[in-house]
Amino acid sequence: MGEEIRLLSSKGLETHSSFCLPEDIFRNRLTWLCSEIRNSGFWIWSLSWLPLAVWWGMASTWFYPLLTSVVLILALIAILPVVQIQYSKYTLSNQLTQLSKEIIKSAPGAYSADWDAVAIHFNSYLYENKAWKTAHFFFNGTDCQEAFRKTILEPAVLRRQNEDPRFSSIEILVPYTEDAVQVYFTKVNAQWRLIHGKKECKLTMLENVKLPKETYRCKLAWSCQRIRISFSPLDFLPDMSDFFICANLSPACLVSYWLIDIFFRMIDDFQNIRPKSMKVDDKMQYLSDIINEQGASPEKWDTIARKTNTRLFEKRVWKNEEFFFDGTDCQAFFERNFSSLLFSKKSASPRSLNVELWKYIQEAQLSCNYEPLP
């Protein structure tokens, strides 16, 4: 069966050299997504519903007719990205064998740059074989890596953990996945030895780096600043449909309901934005710092927080040197996003289980005599 599935298209390697990642073509993710929607044809389906939405809205007696029409139009527009994302997931689920073969060939690891070649080859394969209408399926190597971790790596490891029949189907229906997982683990282990074995450079200016607890009056002020920086109105565009659902309420109630809904969603995003912003190699360096400190005192966690804040700012992972508020926040982050998910037997979406880091998380726990926070 493996002989029948091509690793590359019939046009050969020279054709792939003409492809590049959407990250290098489009201005940002939004323009890329709009382009993908335009090429997919879903927007034509949506436009066909606009006259009906306007007519039904103007004829509605629930609320102001014009406002109802506007809300319906916005709801149709908001549906397009959702449909596009779901369709891309469906396409990916049918191409896991090809993705696994590309991984086996390129042997990527923790670093996102390792995945750029995999993303380019996979994008061009889908386009040339008419499985996708453009050569821009994955925006960059990071997206390709995360897709592998969620659709192949986590199910394979979870199946090993509990031998759950729900996960056994991936090995039966999708060949090469186990080999791809093994190749990935081998490369990650080699990169871990390089990261952890590298002699730590003394950060001479680390003593001058202030933690947010030393510059803000309280943690609430720091949290509000974080929420303000990370807030994006586009994230809440689909919530506009809530106005239509509750159109029989007064305008004041509608506004209050929407604001409260957005507030709680922002708090949830506030909890998840930090682990999402860290790539696998950033997490490996964070765990290496914990192991190297060899202790669980507040002072050592403060040191880890300073190192991480400085490093993530220098790598442009974070906009400022305020990733962690203090050592306690740093320790709580370790508990929530690493220790609590260790050897989990089920997915913790939207959080990553970090299954490739489990043995390093254990080592970090042992090095600092870790005890969960109360």
From Swiss-Prot:
GO terms for biological process: endocytosis; protein transport to vacuole involved in ubiquitin-dependent protein catabolic process via the multivesicular body sorting pathway. The keyword Transmembrane helix applies. Residues 60-62 are extracellular. One of its GO terms (cellular component) is endosome. It holds the Pfam family DUP. The chain crosses the membrane at residues 37-59, 63-85. It is found in: Membrane. Present with 2370 molecules/cell in log phase SD medium. InterPro entries: DUP/COS (IPR001142). It comes from the Eukaryota. It is a multi-pass membrane protein. The gene is COS10. Belongs to the DUP/COS family. Residues 1-36, 86-374 are cytoplasmic. The keyword Chloroplast does not apply. Keywords: Membrane, Transmembrane, Transmembrane helix. This is Protein COS10. Its main location: membrane.
